[in-house]
């Protein structure tokens, strides 16, 4: 691992931290559940995207950029999508309306997460491109006695799997009550879940051995992870809310279809998010999308930069609940404003930060160490380069703000005027110009020309 400490990650499957040992160090594989593209992603959705982006970056640093495969899916077949399509595009044929909804939502999702400084995953499969793979797994499950056909549906028989519930660690009856699973007369057991359901003439559907229909939610991720990562892979991630039933049912499907002991060796889950101390919901009036936060004044009466949202998320450990607030965003913004805009060059990330990340992705300690490095970077060029390399690893590399040419010319003129005032020993006027520029976010740096020894002043836009 090239000087890195052992990477320890908390495994929901075992309820303990474990040293990460990839199945194949030349191809480290991670799957994270992506968005269902019926509505713009909200700030709660942003948390797993950011958390697992940091892990992706860390794995690439440790094992090499070409030796990590990160799959994050797009769920583009779902009853919520159908309902949104009918609501938003009542004049279009359903398939066209669905396409209009999913394409617009997926495009917005990509734009949003790019503004949060997230790398693109190695592969981003859509559910609709993997229907054949889903039906193949379902056929296997029927063939080996883990699934059955009833009332036009294919259902997974939860009692057929001796250790069903290994992830949530709860008795089956308790799981069903907690997840409010509907009890249908055609089910063998109340906890049995749908693998395939028939579609009416006005619903999207695909031909299958069980008639024209569409997949259940859980089978989608089993099929896509199998196709791109194999029967067993290294890490599966998502939010706490996905442990049951989604991830539990993924495990059941995949293990029973492929005859494996596990689906993924490590299961990671990020904590819940509240907004100003309350659960986020449309009924509470505190539902905030990523797009709204970045581009409207809906939260705190202003727009917030993507890097502020990213840092605000990383200032809480990924396993802990997070109270998302204006105060938290302001704190993150103040911190970012103190960080220099420097280039990493050939520098390596800071060892203290790497140690923190290797300790179950402790971004809280990592951010604290990064801030200390930023303070040193103001006077130490070597620390500056190391800071930039470390910030880049976290997806927090400060960017120099762009400025209009006309504004730049005006700043140049004021800087030149200040130099004239200094030459004339009119320090009061020179200070006035400096203060005026500082108030507008322009930072001046005085120095000497190496050849002539004359005073020179450079400037940059502060963050």
From Swiss-Prot:
EC annotation from Swiss-Prot or TrEMBL: 6.1.1.16
Where, in this chain's numbering, is ATP bound? 282
Return the motif ranges for 'KMSKS' region. 279-283
- Please verify whether the record's keywords include ATP-binding: yes
**UniProt entry tagged with the keyword Ligase:** yes
Disulphide bridges, residue numbers: none
So what family is this one in?
Answer: Belongs to the class-I aminoacyl-tRNA synthetase family.
Protein name as it appears in the record: Cysteine--tRNA ligase
Native species = Rhizobium leguminosarum bv. trifolii (strain WSM2304)
Its lineage opens with:
Bacteria, Pseudomonadati, Pseudomonadota, Alphaproteobacteria, Hyphomicrobiales
Gene name on record?
cysS
């Amino acid at each position: 691992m090239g000087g890195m400490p052992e990477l320890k990650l908390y495994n929901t499957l075992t309820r303990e931290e474990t040293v990460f040992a990839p199945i194949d160090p030349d191809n480290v594989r991670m799957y994270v559940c992506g968005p269902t593209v019926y509505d713009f992603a909200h700030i709660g959705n942003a948390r797993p995207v950011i958390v697992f982006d940091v892990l992706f970056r860390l794995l690439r640093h440790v094992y090499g950029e070409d030796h990590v495969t990160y799959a994050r899916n797009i769920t583009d077949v779902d009853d919520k999508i159908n309902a949104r399509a009918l609501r938003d595009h009542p004049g279009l044929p359903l398939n066209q309306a669905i396409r209009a909804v999913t394409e617009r939502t997926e495009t917005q999702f990509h734009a949003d997460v790019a503004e949060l400084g997230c790398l693109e995953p190695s592969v981003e499969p859509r559910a609709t491109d993997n229907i054949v793979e889903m039906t193949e797994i379902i056929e296997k499950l029927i063939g080996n006695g883990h699934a059955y056909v009833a009332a036009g549906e294919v259902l997974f028989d939860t009692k057929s799997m001796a250790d069903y519930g290994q992830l949530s660690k709860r008795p089956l009856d308790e799981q069903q009550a907690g997840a409010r699973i509907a009890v249908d007369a055609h089910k063998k057991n109340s906890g049995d879940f749908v693998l395939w359901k028939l579609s009416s003439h006005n619903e999207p559907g695909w031909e299958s051995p069980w008639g024209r229909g569409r997949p259940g939610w859980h089978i989608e991720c089993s099929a896509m992870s199998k196709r791109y990562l194999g029967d067993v892979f290294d890490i599966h991630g998502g939010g706490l809310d996905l442990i049951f039933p989604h991830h539990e049912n993924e495990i059941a499907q995949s293990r029973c279809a492929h005859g494996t002991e596990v689906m993924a060796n490590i299961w990671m889950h990020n904590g819940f998010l509240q907004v100003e101390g309350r659960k986020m919901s449309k009924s509470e009036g505190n539902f905030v999308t990523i797009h709204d936060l970045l581009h409207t004044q809906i939260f705190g009466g202003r727009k917030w930069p993507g890097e502020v949202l990213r840092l605000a998320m990383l200032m809480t450990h990924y396993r802990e609940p997070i109270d998302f607030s204006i105060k938290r965003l302001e704190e993150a913004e103040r911190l970012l404003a103190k960080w220099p805009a420097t280039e990493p060059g050939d520098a390596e990330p800071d060892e203290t930060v790497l140690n923190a990340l290797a300790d179950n992705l402790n971004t809280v300690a990592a951010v604290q160490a990064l801030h200390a490095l930023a303070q040193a970077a103001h006077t130490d060029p070597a620390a500056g380069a190391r800071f930039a390399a470390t910030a880049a690893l976290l997806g927090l590399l400060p960017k120099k703000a762009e400025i209009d040419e006309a504004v730049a010319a005006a700043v140049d003129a004021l800087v030149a005027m200040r130099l004239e005032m200094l030459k004339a020993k009119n320090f009061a006027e020179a200070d006035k110009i400096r203060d005026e520029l500082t108030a507008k976010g322009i930072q001046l740096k005085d120095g000497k020309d190496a050849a002539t020894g004359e005073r020179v002043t450079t400037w940059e836009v502060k963050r």
